């Protein structure tokens, strides 16, 4: 994820965006895997027999059937059954759909919401974490921008709903969702593979926790975030305002929106907090030696 300074500068992005061909290959693979998961074992075995027969007939016994050839042949048969569109037809529709998916309003978010302001800074495969049912739309929006998204919620129904829509929208290639109750730290089974560039938090997941537990949870999120990373705290919980968590972000910078005031100086409706992790962590060793 780019910093605000990098976005304003001329620095090139660290990662190139996906090509349309890559998106098409993902589309094909997702449809094939979805079909395999939707049929029973007997039907899958019949597909394998049909593929083996076709290979033997075409090659007239000139080569040995390998597992790779069999898998490729089965995939081709599934593509025929599904009547998947060729690349040229698929691309025309895909570009329109993806353009819509990348707008906040497509997911019910305000155009000027905190996450919308960060979208120009997001790069493909940025590692992001979205926590809480109130942050559900953020998971869709980030997935549409090719971020690696992990979604956590305490409600199984919410997680299943998000997984279903992600699949239906064709956004599931870099998406994982887990049922997880909020505690002093994130569950051990959640593995991000890299430091977090962006965290979107619905403070409602902290509403029932003690102040100490909230502090420990936020500290764990900070520990997992990379220098220069960003946390967005949404105004999604009536009983716990984003500002109530500010005390846990000592040393982090509050990123203000220059458009937060309307004409005449009237304050806009609260939209949440955007907090930036310092690029250089404090030198705790030096502080300890000074104190001693």
Q: Which role fits each region the language model picked out?
A:
Residues 213-229:
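A short glycine-rich, Lys/Arg-flanked "PGG" loop and its adjoining helix->strand segment in the class I
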Residues 227-237:
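Conserved beta-strand signature within the Rossmann-like core of class I S-adenosyl-L-methionine
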Residues 135-147:
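Conserved SAM-binding loop of SAM-dependent methyltransferases across substrates and taxa
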Residues 161-191:
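S-adenosyl-L-methionine
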Residues 1-106, 286-291:
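N-terminal accessory regions of S-adenosyl-L-methionine
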Residues 239-292:
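Class I S-adenosyl-L-methionine
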Residues 106-126:
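Conserved alpha-helix/loop element of class I SAM-dependent methyltransferases that forms part
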């Amino acid at each position: 994820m780019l910093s605000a300074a990098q976005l304003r500068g001329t620095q090139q992005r660290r990662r190139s965006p996906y090509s349309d061909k890559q998106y098409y290959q993902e589309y094909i693979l997702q449809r094939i895997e979805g079909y395999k998961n939707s049929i029973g074992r007997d039907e899958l075995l019949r597909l394998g027999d049909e593929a083996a027969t076709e290979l033997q007939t075409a090659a007239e016994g000139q080569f040995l059937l390998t597992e790779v050839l069999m898998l490729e042949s089965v995939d081709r048969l599934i593509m025929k059954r599904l009547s998947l569109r060729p690349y040229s037809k698929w691309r025309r529709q895909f570009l329109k759909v993806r353009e819509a998916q990348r707008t906040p309003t497509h997911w019910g978010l305000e155009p000027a919401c905190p996450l919308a302001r960060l979208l120009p800074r997001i790069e493909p495969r940025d590692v992001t974490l979205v926590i809480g049912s109130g942050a559900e739309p953020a998971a869709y929006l980030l997935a549409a921008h090719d971020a690696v998204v992990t979604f956590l919620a305490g409600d199984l129904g919410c997680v299943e709903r998000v997984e279903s829509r992600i699949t239906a929208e064709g956004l599931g290639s870099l998406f994982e969702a887990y049922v997880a109750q909020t505690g002093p730290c994130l569950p051990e089974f959640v593995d991000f593979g890299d430091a977090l560039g962006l965290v979107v938090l619905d403070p409602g997941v902290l509403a029932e926790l003690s102040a100490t537990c909230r502090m420990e949870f936020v500290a764990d999120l900070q520990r997992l975030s990379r220098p220069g990373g960003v946390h967005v705290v949404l105004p999604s919980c009536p009983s716990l305002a984003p500002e109530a968590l500010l005390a846990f972000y000592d040393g982090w910078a509050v990123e203000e929106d220059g458009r937060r005031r309307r004409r005449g100086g009237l304050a806009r409706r609260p939209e949440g907090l955007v907090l930036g992790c310092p690029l250089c962590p404090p030198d705790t060793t030096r502080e300890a030696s000074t104190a001693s």
